UniProtKB/Swiss-Prot annotation:
Free-text cofactor note: Binds 1 zinc ion.
Organism: Streptococcus agalactiae serotype V (strain ATCC BAA-611 / 2603 V/R)
One Pfam family it belongs to: YbeY
Protein name: Endoribonuclease YbeY
Cofactor section: Zn(2+)
Length: 165
């Protein structure tokens, strides 16, 4: 998995960046998304608020904003066409590899770590996995969806070693 990481705040340690990258690669392996690309941007509450207004019509900052990339065109070819044209097959693979981007508010992560009584590292890991699952089609609008997403989220975090304290 390729992850572009951007720290707009200038406050995220190399350890947190490495943990985020390692954890996203681990989550990608667990979910069969190893050959995908995404971006993670660390932001302030102010920037999170701006992004929420722009993309979600929500007038407040949130801990993580997940923007799933969905191409506006449906490109499909039959197997025979792809077998005859390997360059086309490779182009389609590249086109399909970008899954989206996450914006993680470091301010919210700090607030929530304190509120929930666990480490900042655990909260940052939780937000990365939560956002990753969202851009891969998981959601929690219904009780069934919530159960599926949250159990997978906890399974990934626990297997990685970021348990609730």
């Amino acid at each position: 998995m390729y992850v572009e990481m951007i720290d707009e705040t200038g406050q995220v340690s190399e350890d947190i960046k490495k943990q985020t990258l390692d954890l996203l690669e681990f989550a990608a392996q667990k979910t069969g998304k190893e050959n995908k690309e995404m971006a993670v941007t660390f932001v302030t509450n102010e920037r999170s608020h701006e992004l929420n207004l722009e993309y979600r019509d929500t007038d407040r900052p949130t801990d993580v904003i997940s923007l799933e990339y969905k191409p506006e065109v449906d490109i499909s070819f039959d197997e025979e066409d792809l077998a005859e044209n390997p360059e086309l097959a490779e182009m389609l693979e590249d086109f399909d590899s970008y899954i989206g981007e996450l914006f993680i508010s470091i301010d919210k992560a700090k607030e929530q770590a304190e509120e929930y009584g666990h480490s900042y590292e655990r909260e940052m890991g939780f937000l990365a996995v939560h956002g990753f699952l969202h851009i891969n089609g998981y959601d929690h609008y219904t009780p069934e969806e919530e159960k599926e997403m949250f159990s997978l989220q906890e399974e990934i975090l626990t297997a990685y070693g970021l348990k609730r304290q």
